[in-house]
């Protein structure tokens, strides 16, 4: 729920009669997808919107970080995700762009997913239960089991780890790429990988992500899975009657929040062949 000046509203009522904009260029998220030498590199970045209150455009830092990652991949496609992020971060730091962002990078081959995650973006592997390595999940009606790859990193509730720069303290108030969660997991043919900014996972439970994937697989596939997940996240973010994963976590932290969490949503989906 954004106005034309980029400011966000908590709910429809907060718009005071104004129409929310549909201009995707106002999103504070950034992403890229590059395939080099049979490896697919993907990154999603979530700019911190509160910079707008300080007169800083919160879109600039995540976009610069995303572009620097792409340039690094072009020069050194064999680097690991954490190495890519480290080089990109150093480049953006030299440019002294005010702002901050979470970051999630993946490198996916036919048999392996390598990741580097700093903050609260998320990545889930959706796997059919007859495939090796699938953990048992109870109470999930979907065909595929959601396997969480990287956990959130939070300083406090709703305060994720982030990379950034400020003209008052440089990079000191923020984390560095060395603070990121890194690792590798095996992937198998027909696995579906969903990576997204927190706008998805704050509003859509993992079980529901798997159910939407099921619906997509049994549909005519006119819409992409990423589009369907974005639509699901937006719908649930505007629902004041049903507590979202964000609202449930808020209440665990003694924060009174009900319903969904309006936010920018960026989703990238990959299917392993």
Residue spans of the language-model regions?
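PP2C/PPM-type serine/threonine phosphatase catalytic domain
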Residues: 1-273
